[in-house]
A protein has these predicted regions:
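Hydrophobic alpha-helical segments within soluble ligand-binding/sensing domains
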Residues: 45-69, 116-117, 163-167
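Short, structured loop/turn "capping" segments at alpha-beta junctions
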Residues: 66-71, 97-105, 126, 130-131
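Local beta-strand N-terminus motif with an aromatic residue
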Residues: 2, 41, 129-130, 176
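Extracellular/periplasmic periplasmic-binding protein-like sensory domains
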Residues: 82, 87, 94-96, 101, ...
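An alpha-beta-alpha
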Residues: 56-97
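Hydrophobic alpha-helical
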Residues: 3-23, 90, 105-166
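Flexible loop/hinge segments that line or gate small-molecule binding clefts
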Residues: 15-51, 164-172
Length: 176
């Protein structure tokens, strides 16, 4: 027996169908991190990711100032609604107020830190003049390591989300 369902999952068509079916039990559904939208009866507990992405975009714009420059967007999983909303908010903020910033690409790490670091390193080799990295995902340490290996690290801005112990350490070290 149970009184409710608490779920933390990516937005996936099979999960949405299962949640719709679960609604017939009249038990509450609490969705952590992912808002499954109006088609699924649930309570969403989590941040407003679109606004968080907009804030990140405004910060990137302010840090890069009028000079602007090239920026890379790092995603973990495109199926994660929150991450998608963050990226949409980030892009909207850049588009509406920072025309000197050019988003040169969006890479997806699959929530794999090592892959995130490699993708950033690869982008830096193709765009040595890259000025900013926006990470909508969880792989901050490996991205910071990739940035630490290039010249002019101080010219690059790295923005991410969350204040985990790992990110607190990176923030104190000046990597974020």
């Amino acid at each position: 027996r149970f009184d409710a369902l608490i779920i933390c999952a990516a937005e996936d068509p099979e999960i949405v169908v299962a949640l719709r079916g679960f609604a017939a039990t009249d038990k509450p559904v609490v969705a952590l991190a992912t808002d499954f939208g109006p088609d699924v009866l649930h309570i969403h507990v989590g941040p407003d990711d679109y606004r968080a992405g907009m804030l990140a975009g405004h910060l990137m714009g302010r840090f890069l100032s009028r000079e602007g420059g090239k920026v890379l967007v790092v995603a973990g999983m495109s199926l994660m609604v929150g991450q998608r909303q963050r990226r949409e908010g980030f892009r909207a903020a850049i588009a509406e107020g920072f025309s000197a910033i050019q988003i040169v690409g969006e890479v997806e790490s699959g929530e794999n830190g090592e892959k995130a670091g490699l993708l950033v390193a690869r982008t830096l080799s193709r765009h040595p003049d890259l000025r900013g990295i926006y990470n909508a995902s969880a792989d901050a340490a490996e991205i910071a390591e990739a940035l630490a290996r290039v010249q002019d690290r101080g010219r690059r801005v790295f923005i991410t989300h969350g204040l985990t112990e790992d990110r607190r350490r990176l923030l104190r070290a000046g990597a974020i």
